[in-house]
Amino acid sequence: RSRGLGDVYKRQMNVLEDNLYTRSWQKLGMTLPRPQAIVVVSAHWFTRGTGVTAMETPPTIHDFGGFPQALYDTHYPAPGSPVLAQHLVELLAPVPVTLDKEAWGFDHGSWGVLIKMYPDADIPMVQLSIDSSKPAAWHFEMGRKLAALRDEGIMLVASGNVVHNLRTVKWHGDSSPYPWAMSFNEYVKANLTWQGAVEQHPLVNYLDHEGGALSNPTPEHYLPLLYVLGAWDGQEPITIPVDGIEMGSLSMLSVQIG
């Protein structure tokens, strides 16, 4: 059965760096069973409705500004899979899923991690968008539907950050984590294996935590985690390949199921 990886994306410069986090992603790529294909849920494709990339050769999207030229010169030419995209349309029904053949591609939430895990870019991939109009529990249920892919050897990668507050980022000097960021990061880890009604899940109700709103002033970087937790069968081990908080308020926590 294929693995699920949650909240593995962090910040753009990791693409060019060799550090604790990038080495952990490289290790995952070398040690996990090689998937037949990969479905990525990225914080950077936050849409009204649900879409899936359905082109043969998705472009590499550089959806950021103000970084070194080397980052813009980096491309990740992994093949797309229109067949897998259509499979997702059928699997997620009755949720309507739009086949995107030109508007998007692989944004840095997906290729920024996968270029470290699978640098040869030779595994077929599709990217699934996050519907901005739906509540947290809905995204968890989407993960439950995606769980079937894992039995087909398809890896689910959810890319985001459980703490992502750019307004409080420490760009210079002291980069120690804020107490509220550490508290929320620990809260997430403590509740990864919680089982019960989805509507009562502490990580679905993350805004109930005193640091939830400050850690996630907008939801798009948090929600990918719920897709992976939804795909968990309740019995597999859940492990943390790497953890940490950078620049005060960017969580580097990665979660692996299976």
Description of each model-found segment:
Residues Y9, V41, L88, L128, ...:
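A residue-level signal for conserved active-site and pocket-lining positions in enzyme catalytic cores
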Residues N19-P33:
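Short catalytic helix/loop segments, enriched in acidic residues and glycine
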Residues R11, H44-F46, V162-V163:
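Catalytic metal-binding/acid-base residues of hydrolase active sites
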Residues R1-L5, Y9:
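Single conserved hydrophobic/aromatic residue that forms the stacking wall/gate
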Residues T53-P77:
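A charged helix-plus-loop insertion that forms the helical arch/lid used to bind
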Residues A85-F140, K145:
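Internal, conserved structured core segments that host functional sites
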Residues P33-G49:
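N-terminal low-complexity or amphipathic/hydrophobic leaders
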